[in-house]
Amino acid sequence: EIPVSYPSLSEQKSIAAILTSFDDKIELLQAQNKTLEELAQTIFKEWFAKYKVGDKLPDGWGVGKLSEFGKIICGKTPSKSNEDYFGNDIPFIKIPDMHNKVFILETTDNLSIEGAKSQNNKMLPKNSICISCIATVGLVSITTKKSQTNQQINSIIPNENYFREFLYFTLTKMKNYLNDLGSGGTATLNVNTSTFSNIELVKPKEDIIKDFHKLSNPIFEKVLQNNTQIQTLTKTRDALLPKLMSGEIRVKK
């Protein structure tokens, strides 16, 4: 038999209490984010969602193409034959990085400075809005730092900072429409950059978009703050667990 050491029962209970405190805090922040996102979405629906392209619009409102709200960028993957193009410098966003995330805090892959410079025209600044447009269509997320994406993602760099929340919710509610646009009689959904750029949407008066930004921006910033805290708590908990179980870190009984 191989002897196995393990913490005493009282120490196991202390370890469980520590880990539970992390889980409870994470769940609390996740619940808070859900409430905050629903609040911002409710305000958006009340202000904007009742109007569609083709409807009679309020005075001063109109219809504009998506490209009128910002610069459209289609992502690209650097040559994989050059290993120097990949590293830990620039987040490289792919569709799995976007699932159920308002903000993209981390990515599974990253580019080197050299790799990013090889396609510098694909660089996205912070607060760009990414939309998945091939295969899995209609996911919408916001960048939190300078990033690039692969070719399955179209992004918009808003012309004005106060467009961010309006564009996020406008694009989020277009999921079914984007799926219809991308069907094209093929098995794989694909909304190409030209089609994406020419999507028409209701264009409210700019001062109304600004007012919505004033209300929703603090909500989005709180969601981002909570997400950052969740990320830190999760990494700390996961790093602590093996050390607690191995006895490398001991807790008082």
List each language-model region with its residue ranges.
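Hydrophobic positions within alpha-helical membrane elements
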Residues: 102, 252-253
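Non-catalytic DNA-recognition/assembly elements of restriction-modification systems
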Residues: 3-77, 92, 96, 202, ...
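DNA target-recognition domains and sequence-specific DNA-contacting regions of bacterial/archaeal
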Residues: 1-6, 58, 62-204
